[in-house]
């Protein structure tokens, strides 16, 4: 079942998404100067492929210290991930707005385990999700494994 589930999730995460969304994801990744492993795009805008309203992203970053934020926010992330912030991205005449959640892959993995008291991660990522940006093939494979774990936990 796991291989089949992984295959289904890999196909789902590879769905086409609007170019401005991919560009926004790449910009988020650039903010952490190489420490981002993946940017996930999910939520109602993924279902509709609309650029209106607030886009939803999860940024997986190797080390939370690499993400540009204040020291107190970094400490808070270690205690209660993810950190969530609002970002805007102007591309041509189009202004995109997004809610951006940030956590490490290990925090994501811990949140998708059966023993986790926080159900928000595995519940959220049991729904459609696209990988809007990945650093490389290894990061993509690891991200798909994390998403498979979320679905298996649900």
Predicted regions and their residues:
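Short hydrophobic/aromatic beta-strand micro-patches
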Residues: 58-60
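Catalytic core of pol beta-like nucleotidyltransferases
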Residues: 1-35, 40, 46-52, 62-154
């Amino acid at each position: 079942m796991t291989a089949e589930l992984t295959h289904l999730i890999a196909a789902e995460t590879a769905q086409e998404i609007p170019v401005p969304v991919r560009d926004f994801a790449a910009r988020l990744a650039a903010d952490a100067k190489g420490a981002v492993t993946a940017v996930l795009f999910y939520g109602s805008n993924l279902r509709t492929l609309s650029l209106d309203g607030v886009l939803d992203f999860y940024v997986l970053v190797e080390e939370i210290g690499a993400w540009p934020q204040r020291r107190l926010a970094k400490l808070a992330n270690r205690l209660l991930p993810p950190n969530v912030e609002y970002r805007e991205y102007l591309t041509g005449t189009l202004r995109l707005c997004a809610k951006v959640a940030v956590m490490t892959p290990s925090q994501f993995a811990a949140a998708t385990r059966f023993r986790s008291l926080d159900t928000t991660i595995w519940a959220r990522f049991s729904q459609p999700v696209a990988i809007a940006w990945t650093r490389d093939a290894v990061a993509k494979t690891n991200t798909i494994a994390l998403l498979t774990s979320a679905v298996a936990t649900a």
